[in-house]
Amino acid sequence: MQISQAGINLIKSFEGLQLKAYKAVPTEKHYTIGYGHYGSDVSPRQVITAKQAEDMLRDDVQAFVDGVNKALKVSVTQNQFDALVSFAYNVGLGAFRSSSLLEYLNEGRTALAAAEFPKWNKSGGKVYQGLINRRAQEQALFNSGTPKNVSRGTSSTKTTPKYKVKSGDNLTKIAKKHNTTVATLLKLNPSIKDPNMIRVGQTINVTGSGGKTHKVKSGDTLSKIAVDNKTTVSRLMSLNPEITNPNHIKVGQTIRLS
């Protein structure tokens, strides 16, 4: 499963947005920007847009999406999944994996799992109102209904292909390896400002030329194409970063489906 826009919005509401690079503590090695993105890829005077900040957040959250997917042994709803990713993003994957919340959930004791959220209200042994508020919203989302359950391993939504940068890699080499272009990789990875500055171990969104495509016909909309191909609009937009407005596609345009 993938986190939905509602899940991203929940995390955004707690993280706070900074469009200019800053150091929360002067002694920190690297700068922070966006929704808490921290690392060597943030330059001292860097300024980004809100869209770029969300893209960075999605990149950062992906590891937690993958971690939650691996830890779950039961079917969950989209809202439950979003709440779990937000929770894991805040407490860490290690704490999530060893939590009673996950244990109860995997045992099918959903009500007991939901009751665990409020217990995670401390940092350094001290209770914080911000954590009380966050847990309450995650719990409410977890308990809220969705149209139907999504079975483990049967969701039609697929993750965007990923590639982990190895020693000796550059963006041109990675593009050739995946039958794509540097320009496409930059669109898929808006957090990369300089194609010559990627680091070993960095995870990059990639795409290949062998996937299924659809040529837009008269009367097509992105929603119709998504339904016809058993996918989602958000998935299509992630596969086609050149589409910035789902209402603006043109006849003859080729859209990647996988």
Curated annotation (Swiss-Prot):
Keyword terms of this UniProt record: Antimicrobial, Bacteriolytic enzyme, Cytolysis, Glycosidase, Host cell lysis by virus, Host cytoplasm, Hydrolase, Viral release from host cell
Gene expressing this chain: 15
InterPro entries: Bacteriophage_GH24 (IPR051018), Endolysin_autolysin (IPR033907), Endolysin_T4_type (IPR034690), Glyco_hydro_24 (IPR002196), LysM_dom (IPR018392), LysM_dom_sf (IPR036779), Lysozyme-like_dom_sf (IPR023346), Lysozyme_dom_sf (IPR023347)
Sequence similarity: Belongs to the glycosyl hydrolase 24 family.
Protein name: Endolysin
Function field: Endolysin with lysozyme activity that degrades host peptidoglycans and participates with the holin and spanin proteins in the sequential events which lead to the programmed host cell lysis releasing the mature viral particles. Once the holin has permeabilized the host cell membrane, the endolysin can reach the periplasm and break down the peptidoglycan layer.
SMART domains with a match to the protein in the record: LysM (SM00257)
EC code: 3.2.1.17
GO annotation (BP), single: viral release from host cell by cytolysis
Catalysed reaction, written as an equation: Hydrolysis of (1->4)-beta-linkages between N-acetylmuramic acid and N-acetyl-D-glucosamine residues in a peptidoglycan and between N-acetyl-D-glucosamine residues in chitodextrins
Compartments where located: Host cytoplasm
First-level EC class: hydrolase
Keyword check for Hydrolase: yes
Pfam families the UniProt entry points to: LysM (PF01476), Phage_lysozyme (PF00959)
MF terms in GO: lysozyme activity
Active site (catalytic residues): E15
Organism of provenance: Bacillus phage phi29 (Bacteriophage phi-29)
Statement: the UniProt record of this protein carries the keyword Transferase: no
Cellular component GO terms, alphabetical: host cell cytoplasm
Stored HAMAP family: ENDOLYSIN_T4 (MF_04110)
Lineage: superkingdom: Viruses
Major subcellular location class: host cell
Taxonomic lineage of the native organism: Viruses, Duplodnaviria, Heunggongvirae, Uroviricota, Caudoviricetes
Entry comment, domain topic: LysM domains are thought to be involved in peptidoglycan binding.
